[in-house]
Amino acid sequence: FPETKKKIFRDFPDVLSDEYKENAKNNAKALAARKNDPMMIGYFLRNEPSWAFVDNLVLADEVLYNPERTVCKEKLIAALKEKYQTVEALNTAWNTKFNDFDDLYQPIRDASAKSDAAKEDQKTFSKEMLRAYVEIPSKACREVDPNHMILGMRWAWISDPDLATGWENFDVFSINCYA
């Protein structure tokens, strides 16, 4: 599964970066040798990502809490600038007191808890990140091997329906069950 040097949270990569896309393509090349194997039905993209072991995780909150200047952070801040236009409008919606949009580069804990608008913005961006997390490697794998199913990521569990974002890229949505 593709990784990036900078992480958003635990093993969650900077999924909106070019590095993630390139690593997805490079990792998918490993499938070429078995693309015509009639004994194989498919493959799992990964197994139980460690970032997903946190109940009700809002990934965009981790973007703003993480001190790294990631591509995800750049795109989140750009989306907020586009939506709100002024820091005053953002402050009103989010119930915050930022001096300017650059304040968003400083670690901010639990941004989605600041207001309903903040929660909506953060959950929307989290879904964009989750979609990229799943879609980019899925497409890279299908380009190399269109003959086998993508069997999902073998989630440990799903604590929030948003974690299923991007499921349409799988042929099978898989969850490990240890009951």
Where is each model-derived feature located?
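Catalytic domains of carbohydrate-active enzymes, especially glycoside hydrolases
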Residues: F1, I41, F173
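Alpha-helical scaffold elements lining the catalytic groove of polysaccharide deacetylases
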Residues: Y20-K21
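Conserved thiamine diphosphate
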Residues: S17
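Extended hydrophobic/aromatic segments used for targeting, binding, or gating
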Residues: A156-A179
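Short, charged, surface-exposed secondary-structure boundary motifs
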Residues: P2-R10
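Polysaccharide-binding and catalytic clefts of secreted carbohydrate-active enzymes
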Residues: F9-D14, N26, A30, N36-A164
